[in-house]
Amino acid sequence: MKIDYQKVFEPIKRKFGDVKIKTAIILGSGLGDFVEELNQVTSISTSDVNDYPVSTIPGHSGKIFLCEYSNSYHIVFKGRIHLYEGYSINQVVLPTVISKMFNAKYLIVTNAAGGISENLKPADLMLIDDLFFLHYKAKFRELASSTKNKFAINKELNDFVFELSKKINIELKRGVYAYSSGPSYETPAEIRFLKIADCDAVGMSTIPEILYASNNDLPVIAISCITNYAAGITENKLSHEEVTDTANIVKEKFSKLIRTIIKELPRYWNKSNN
């Protein structure tokens, strides 16, 4: 489905004005309360934006916030759109497109994910170092140009974030994030396959945003909140309620980490551009 991105962007631009956006943040399932940690300048409901799809998932309210923190402006998306809701890939990446149109310096993408690795448990935070989406490359081909010979994850930026986490005494794991199309959770057999492939966590979002951002020279930091064990790891039945409950438990350290990142990113920017 083709989208007139400029038409989508215009009402948001009118609402937010001519501001310089430092960081764009996409909040995953159960992590929407983070926006309360920032000074909210103004906001717009996605229902008031031309052709903006409506998220149908609990915990994704569908609002875009202009926030101020640490003497900078940030745009925060509370409400993600997923492919499994029936939307096109061009709709799913709308928050990333808008972030780029605002000339954001960085994109922080967050998600709730199921833990596969024995090193991960619910309430852990994982910095995404690599991606696994073998079966979806054809679907995502329009997001990543073959002429851009670079890896989507910036190792130096990830190392910077990891060092920040140690300074504020937050345990941040690192690992490989696998994409699953949803809407159903993965089967135990699929999880065993992903484990053999050295994947650490699995979820139903994030990779489209990372690919679009990388292809459009928008540096990305991607963080998973491990909200449950993946299917077959334990005998517990998976549910969205478990996802949101665990995200609520982890929100204090999650908020501290994200606030620290957006505060310290100018230091990385100055270092990497000198």
Give the role of each language-model region.
Residues 11, 15, 156, 160-171, ...:
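Generic non-transmembrane alpha-helical segments
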Residues 99-103, 195, 214:
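Non-catalytic positions within long, well-ordered alpha-helices that form the structural scaffold/packing
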Residues 140-180:
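Metal-dependent peptidase/peptidase-like ectodomains
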Residues 1-149:
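Metabolite-binding pocket within alpha/beta catalytic cores that recognizes anionic/polar moieties
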Residues 204-242:
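Zn-dependent metallopeptidase/amidohydrolase metal-coordination segment
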